[in-house]
Amino acid sequence: MAAGLRLGPLLRYVDGSAGGAADTPAGATATVWVEADRPCTARVRCADGAEGSARTFQIAGHHYAVIPVTGLTPGAATPYEVLLDDHGVWPLPGSPFPPSTIRVPETGDGSALRVAFGSCRWAAKPGNGRLARGGPDALDTLATTLAADPEAERPDVLLLLGDQVYADETSPAVRRRLAARRDPRDPPGSEVADYEEYSWLYDESWGDPEVRWLLSTVPSSMIFDDHDVIDDWNTSASWLAEMRATPWWRERILSGLMSYWVYQHLGNLSPAELAADPLYAEVCAAPDGTEALRRFASEADADPARTRWSNRRDFGRTRLVTIDTRAARVLDEDGRSMLDPDEARWVREQVLDAPGSYDHLLVATSLPWLLPPLIHDAEAWSAALCRGGRGRRWAWFGEDLRRRSDLEHWAAFPASFDWLSGLLTEAAGRADAPATVCVLSGDVHHAYVAEPVGDEGTGARVLQLTCSPLHNAIPAVVRLGFRFAWSRAGRRLGRALARHGRVPRRSFGWHRTGGPWFGNQLMTLTLRGRAATLRLNQARAVRGGGGRLERTEERRLA
């Protein structure tokens, strides 16, 4: 029986600068991720002659391949097909969608780079439970728009900044599968428990026909946030100790890290990085790579400093540094840090490497750097209480508040907030500074633009660009809370909390220059030379079902 395609293809890494391994032919490169239903050789064959192949590797009874494609032409778009053991499996027979293409952006002077980003996509359709009023899915709507006009302007890369799946908030369809497999009264109940159940989340998210086609033709880069594992993942040392004391947590965290490595992380790597990765080589060489990957996940959980999920991409004269703000945390209250020392050193090196070689610096972090001022001050206040600054009873209150209110962004790690602020200021203030330094984030279920006050003298414009969710719902009371958090009254309340916690005064202030916008939405940066334009599109429901993308905001940044 011929091998079949279970999931994918996903077009992941696309590079117009011949970023393949040293022994690959010249030309642009790409990687395509697939899951097959049995061991096989997966091949990508392009209409212009570019191609690549890879043997599947096995994890927990599943069969995957990451196919390096070489010989692509920068500036060109070529349709491609996927074959398993030389049997065509993509495009699907009778597909209503246009052919999937690999489009390699040009990186020369005058060429534009379009970077779209967002986060927090609950994959269930709007009619399911709590999302009955959530509205159309922004990725579904983008797919419908592009499929209707294949020549329309499209992103050169799609950044998915966390909560690609919700391991702790499963849909009715997934809950039915869980109940058929095990007793839902046993922990973790309706949450996923192991690798197999994680695979169902990705099936649901990426198997959606519109999103499946979109991800087959628009390159993507991804980083996790908390719901990819569990709400409030690594919020504090006491939280982690409590989780490790449960009978189900170890399998959950190992399966979460294993599935992230397979489904998301591998596609962030270039063909050269894949070829040099010892774990990838070990997994591919083994008849069954499960134990090797499980050992890696166990080591990463025990000592996060041994693993790096952060990554860097250079798109011509645009640099993207994506920071892991979940797994690399140092949680000891006396030394809390968003990043361990080695991770922080690596991020700094990537940001400051080769000064003058880029016109735009994009720092992607699932958690916003600049928050509404009230929330920032509340997080700094809570962190001060937890350190014992107001005594033991206030420390208990601070920890309880931190967990109940999700007070775990950069502001909840004051030393790390100051470190990141200093790094961005240094990058923006050099004589050979880029035109813009943009922090791209999600998580907070609304979109906004914020800018530091008093940075007009720097060489670069520094901005916090936040866009969330792609598909989720936010109660009206929470919307009101976010609006209040940006208000003057909210600022005054935040300062009062900071004084109570004896929090040092902030070294700089910031103001909101756009938003807040609420809804299912996607931000896009268009970068051309030293010019930059921002656009926000929101998914709006249309009569008769479905949705359309509506341009809510467009502005020039540089």
Feature map (PLM): residue ranges:
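Metal-dependent phosphoester/phosphodiester hydrolase catalytic core
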Residues: 1-558
